[in-house]
Amino acid sequence: MVWLDEYMQCLSSLMTAGVTHMRTLLQSSSKEGGRSVLDDNYLAITAIVTVLYQFSFFLIAAGCKFDKVTDFAGSTNFVILALLTAILHNTWYFRQIVLTVLVGIWGVRLALFLLFRILQWGEDRRFDDKRENLLKFAAFWIIQAVWVWTVSLPVTIVNASDRNPDIQAADIVGWVLWFVGALTEAVADQQKLAFKNNPANKGKWCDAGLWGFTRHPNYFGEILLWWGIFIAATPVLKGGQWAVIAGPIFITAVLLFLSGIPLLEASADKRYGGLAEYRRYKTRTSPLVPLPPSVYGNLPSWVKKFLLLELPLYNSKLTD
């Protein structure tokens, strides 16, 4: 994939040059006393960059009905915001470097994986009912822009801060949670891709590896890693900055109640709901938190529902 390497090198060069030029302009247009014309937390510039970045890819996707750039645009946007805020503030404290690197590793890994997958599959079925409806398609991209900006808030605030307290337990806990979450997501993605690419598994749902312990291990990993990022950011937060908890709450809510688990459960129920073995799989397999099937399958229904999030929403398309 030589074209991809060239694209990434070009993107990196353009972004570095652009950010350097932007910082020069901002410094030259500062108010008296050295205060930037932008807000101290870089909320405006990250919002502007996110909107412009997503809009540019939306034009490609909508104009060419081209699904291959959608997830790539979302994942790489996180990396751009983390690097942008780090370069603009230019303090490079250890905590800032670590969080920027963690977001970069996650974003690049996910972007390349999703790009490789969509190149194999050819199209994204999520957009089957949206490609011909510009308003629906635009709504998806608007939500994606809000998702990127909101979930990036903890790293944005850390990179914009002059506070640099010593490394604390919260940092270590956050980094560990990120590592466990990122590893879980990466392993789950590879296991499912390998399962789907095996002709022997055609017409089957994935229950291999981590997918035998939870129906959505990739989402469990993603939720865990973003809560880890938030926890690692807490030593820097003060006052109203604690509102950045909206980031992990937002990604958790989206995956649990909106475009994550509900959509995939409905799709799987529609496709496999008539199979007794699939119903047994759902009964014995946790929707999110990994647990041995022998444990989860024997838990009382109230424990599954109230503690492990086996919500009625996840069975709405399962007919009797």
Predicted regions and their residues:
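Interfacial transmembrane-helix boundary/kink motif in multi-pass membrane proteins
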Residues: 98-101, 125-143, 167-172
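Select subsegments of transmembrane alpha-helices in polytopic membrane proteins
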Residues: 72, 135-148, 215-222
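Short, hydrophobic transmembrane alpha-helix segments
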Residues: 32-38, 58-68, 87-91
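Juxtamembrane membrane-interface segments at transmembrane-helix boundaries in membrane proteins
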Residues: 22-40, 129-130
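Hydrophobic transmembrane alpha-helices
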Residues: 2-23, 40-54, 77-107, 151-191, ...
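C-terminal ends of transmembrane helices
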Residues: 55-66, 112-118
